[in-house]
């Protein structure tokens, strides 16, 4: 495929993912600063863009919270963006529900799920952790104690992700 055509396909995929995520998240706001929620997926995508990536990883970064936090489904994502993007989003979506138990139990289930994820999904998750860590540290120091401990445990299973992002995430995590 010609480089120009490939670039256009990549841009179309990213623009479509951004539009889908913006619609899906609608009026949602970030808990820690009240900004429109879409700023988080955009930040995650930009962090992923800073390291070796594929167009599907950027799309998944933009869509990573849609199944978890909106009415969007994996089937809709698969139909709109293809199986590669949908598979990445599936890996990035928490599998636990309140039915599974308290937060500690749920986060452990989600950690085990991510442990088996491909490197591309782990790279997007590292970007997600980095953006969330920065926001939570600044906006909710009390919750940072909980999130920071969870982040530290999660980093144990994300070693196959991008090494630059892994180092950044480790630097943000509590000692």
From Swiss-Prot:
GO cellular component entries: plasma membrane
Entry keyword Zinc-finger: no
Gene Ontology molecular-function annotations: guanosine-3',5'-bis(diphosphate) 3'-diphosphatase activity
Domain HD, residue spans: 37-133
The UniProt record lists the keyword NAD: no
Classification via Gene3D superfamilies: Hypothetical protein af1432
Keywords: Cell membrane, Membrane
Main location: membrane
Protein name as it appears in the record: Uncharacterized 19.2 kDa protein in cobO 3'region
Taxonomic source organism: Sinorhizobium sp
């Amino acid at each position: 495929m010609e480089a120009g055509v490939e670039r256009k396909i990549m841009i179309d995929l990213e623009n479509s993912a951004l539009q889908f995520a913006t619609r899906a998240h609608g009026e949602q706001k970030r808990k820690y600063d009240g900004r429109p929620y879409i700023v988080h997926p955009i930040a995650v995508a930009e962090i992923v863009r800073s390291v070796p990536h594929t167009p599907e990883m950027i799309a998944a970064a933009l869509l990573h919270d849609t199944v978890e936090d909106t009415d969007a489904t994996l089937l809709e994502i698969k139909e709109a963006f293809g199986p590669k993007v949908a598979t990445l989003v599936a890996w990035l979506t928490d599998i636990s529900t309140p039915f599974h138990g308290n937060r500690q139990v749920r986060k452990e289930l989600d950690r085990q799920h991510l442990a088996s994820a491909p490197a591309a999904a782990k790279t997007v998750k590292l970007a997600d952790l980095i953006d969330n860590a920065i926001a939570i540290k600044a906006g909710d120091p009390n919750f940072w104690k909980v999130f920071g401990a969870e982040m530290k445990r999660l980093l144990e299973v994300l070693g196959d992700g991008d090494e630059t992002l892994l180092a950044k995430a480790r630097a943000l995590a509590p000692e």
